[in-house]
Amino acid sequence: IKAIHEKERAAEQRRWEIERREREQQRQLQRKKDAEDFIANKSKFFGLVITDEEIIVKVLESIDEYYNEGKTQGICVFGSGYYKKADTLILSARIGDEIIETVEVDLRTLEVVQCHGKHNQDTEYHERIIDLVNKNANLIRERMKAA
C-alpha cells in the first residue's frame, strides 16, 4: 500500500511540475506579446522630451521603465498594466535624475488625466508639470500623425 501511495504521489508531483512549466511558458509568451504590443503602440513617442529647462518630462520607453517608475514612486503604473493601455501615454517628470511626478495623458483627448508624485502625493511642481505637458500636447499630436 505504501509503495502504491508513493507511486501516486510521484505521479502527482510530475503532473504539478508539468503544469508549473506550462504556466511559466504561458507567462513568458504573454510577457513577450506585451513587449511587442508595447513597442507597436508606443514607439512613435520614444525620444519625446518636454522641458522648461528645469523640469524634464520624458516618455517611459520600456516596460522595465514602467516597473522602475512604479517601484520608485510607490504607485501602480506597472502593477495596473498602464503599458498595455493603447489610449494612454505615461511620462516621467524629472529634475536631474530624480523623478518628481508621473504623468498620464489620454491619447484621445491629449489631456493630463493624472499627475502625481511619490505615493500619489502632489509635489510643489504639480501645476507646473501639468501646464508644461498641456502646453506641449501638440508634440504628442505630431507623433501620432507621423506614425
What spans do the regions from the language model cover?
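Catalytic-core elements of nucleic-acid end-processing and repair enzymes
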Residues: 1-147
